[in-house]
UniProtKB/Swiss-Prot annotation:
Its EC number is 6.1.1.23. Residues 200-203 are annotated as: Aspartate. It catalyses: tRNA(Asx) + L-aspartate + ATP = L-aspartyl-tRNA(Asx) + AMP + diphosphate. This is Aspartate--tRNA(Asp/Asn) ligase. Gene3D superfamilies: Bira Bifunctional Protein, Domain 2, GAD-like domain, Nucleic acid-binding proteins. PROSITE patterns: AA_TRNA_LIGASE_II (PS50862).
């Protein structure tokens, strides 16, 4: 018989009755019934009930003193449970093991929080004792699910003709839109490596190297603040790149992967392929967001022209100054109490708006509300037609400069979806957002900057760049760039790449970069493009967000084994931490006075 176990704790069935077995695991629960002691023994696979009887008083007494989460090995005989004690919620619920002997492999101290329930514990304690937290069923299952998803992704990609690569972790700093994690070089004092924000340049270089289809479950590092769906330091993505492809080729390659994943690991309804494509400008108009939740049926409408000649002075004057008006329908909300409308106004104010106008259309078609008196009957009918308003509905209005009005309308749409319980249940709604602006205005400098990935191919190529003379014309340029969105969560960005040096130099010059600066920052890739680069494109769906959706987790830390907290700290390993002066000296690093003072405190 094996030293520790003959079976796992999820394995024993009624067919194993009278079999002598040995099990090892953690003490999950203990119940003392006087002449009987029951222990639920848990391992990675499941739970088996162990019973100690007064036929062996010493063994039963020893079992009654076992602390929760102690690791034990038990030898005994499988017996059938009586009819009234069968537990159909457990795979092993028809049997139990009558213990003959047990040994304690490792005794547990007093627990900082309860393991055998899903009752919330303080997150700081959970992260500090993550090894305990990971024993809890929900989190344990999430990590198993993550492994299964990644394994299946590898299978799908390999079956589709992709080759898996590993790219460098120590690389050069590049502008990916977030701060780098820098690593000082001992051999080159004063110089730094950067942890890759993404393997962007390397995967493109692999295409130039003659490989056709690349993928990697890639670790990415960005020094950015935490969010519910974003880890503050490290995350993983399914990094993909393909040669000789169009945007549509990328879509038709990734859609089956997403569909297969979401149908395999959930019973919910999944959007059929091909996924709907929504141009960026249309998405901002209809949904007030570039990551729309299509479970929400509300469609925003532009009603600027209706208010342009209305008697509503505030909107009319705003329109003269370049503002717009967006209408956000609220289905079947006309009869709701005044408190609902006040609540929506308070929400808009909390989002930085001056307020939120609205109209209620009764079941008989009568219009009421603070805006009604400023509109003619014809304008009210035009409003209903333009915004698809029916009798019994209400409609809210957002007025501001185009970008601000769109974003406010989008937030109101989301809030209405929640308040009115409009979201379609038990489904995953996918869509592509396409035709992103190539450039944007930098809010701090007021100058032209790349809106997303600087390596994207502008639609129209170099001709489009050369023909755009004014700022307005430059801001109208679009890129072969796309996002895949599911239930309002951006799962990935991707693009057809700019593989021609002359187009890259021109695109960067418009954003204020000289050829020398481009060569300095992206020399390796530019040099490669001068030796025959294939047209190529790619995408990089976020592994963490995919797992988060499939696990129905509300926080990304619930699907990562050892996450950082919101302050980018690892409470288990005490990172980041100060290092000895000797190590700093070897790296030619000197702490600032304030950093030195903090180090001395510790």
């Amino acid at each position: 018989m094996h030293k520790y176990r003959t079976h796992n704790c999820n394995e024993l069935q009624i067919s194993d009755v009278e079999t002598e077995v040995k099990l090892s695991g953690w003490v999950h629960r203990r119940r003392d019934h006087g002449n009987l002691v029951f222990i639920d023994l848990r391992d990675h696979y499941g739970i088996t009930q162990i019973v100690f009887t007064d036929q062996n008083p010493q063994l039963m007494e020893d079992a009654s003193r076992l602390r929760y989460e102690s690791v034990i090995t038990v030898r005994g005989t499988v017996v059938a449970r009586s009819e009234d004690t069968i537990n159909n919620t457990l795979p092993t619920g028809h049997v139990e093991v009558l213990a003959v002997e047990f040994s304690v492999e490792s005794a547990a101290d007093t627990l900082p929080f309860v393991i055998n329930t899903e009752k919330d514990a303080p997150e700081e304690s959970r992260l500090k004792h993550r090894f305990l937290d990971l024993r809890r069923e929900k989190l344990h299952n999430n990590i198993i699910l993550r492994s299964q998803i990644i394994s299946h992704i590898r299978h799908l990609m390999t079956a589709s003709g992709f080759t898996e690569f590993q790219t460098p972790i120590l690389t050069a700093s590049s502008p990916e839109g977030a701060r780098d994690f820098l690593v000082p070089s001992r051999m080159h004092p004063g110089k730094f490596y950067a942890l890759p924000q993404a393997p962007q340049q390397f995967k493109q270089l692999l295409m130039v190297s003659g490989f056709d289809r690349y993928f990697q479950i890639a670790p990415c590092f960005r020094d950015e603040d935490a969010r519910a769906d974003r880890s503050p330091g490290e995350f993983y993505q399914l990094d993909v790149e393909m040669s000789f492809v169009t945007q549509e080729d990328v879509f038709s390659t990734i859609e089956p992967v997403m569909y297969d994943l979401f149908t395999k690991f959930t019973d919910k309804k999944v959007s059929e392929t091909p996924f709907v494509c929504i141009p960026y400008n249309e998405s901002m108009l209809k949904y007030g967001s570039d990551k729309p939740d299509l479970r929400n049926p509300i469609i925003i409408a532009d009603v600027t022209e209706i208010f342009r000649d209305s008697d509503f002075t505030i909107f009319r004057e705003n329109i003269k100054k370049g503002s717009i008006v967006r209408a956000i329908p609220a289905p079947k909300a006309a009869a709701l109490p005044r408190s609902f409308f006040d609540k929506m106004i308070e929400f808009a104010i909390s989002e930085g708006a001056g307020g939120l106008g609205y109209i209620q259309f009764s079941e008989t078609g009568e219009a009421k509300g603070p805006v009604v008196k400023f509109l003619s009957p014809q304008q009210l009918e035009s409003l209903k037609a333009t915004a698809s308003i029916s009798n019994g509905d209400a409609v809210f209005f957002a007025s501001d400069k185009k970008e601000k009005a769109a974003k406010l309308a989008g937030k109101v749409r989301i809030r209405l979806g929640e308040e009115l319980d409009l979201l379609e249940k038990d489904c995953f709604k996918f869509c592509w957002i396409t035709d992103f602006p190539f450039y944007e205005l930098n809010e701090e400098t007021g100058k032209i900057d790349f809106s997303h990935n600087p390596f994207s191919m502008p639609q129209g190529g170099i001709d489009a760049l050369e023909q755009a003379k004014t700022t307005e014309e430059l801001l109208e340029l679009t890129a072969y760039q796309y996002d895949i969105v599911c239930n309002g969560i951006e799962l990935s960005s991707g693009a057809i790449r700019n593989h021609k040096p002359e187009i890259m130099y021109k695109a960067f010059s418009i954003a204020g970069y000289s050829e020398e600066e481009v060569d300095k920052r992206f020399g390796g890739m530019i040099r490669a493009f001068k030796f025959g680069a294939p047209p190529h494109g790619g995408i990089a769906p976020g592994i963490d967000r995919i797992v988060m959706l499939l696990a129905e987790a509300t926080n990304i830390r619930e699907i990562i084994a050892f996450p950082l907290n919101q302050q980018a700290e690892d409470l288990l390993m005490n990172a980041p931490s100060y290092v000895e002066d000797k190590a700093l000296k070897e790296l030619s690093i000197m702490l600032s006075p304030s950093a030195r003072k903090n180090a001395e405190k510790e």
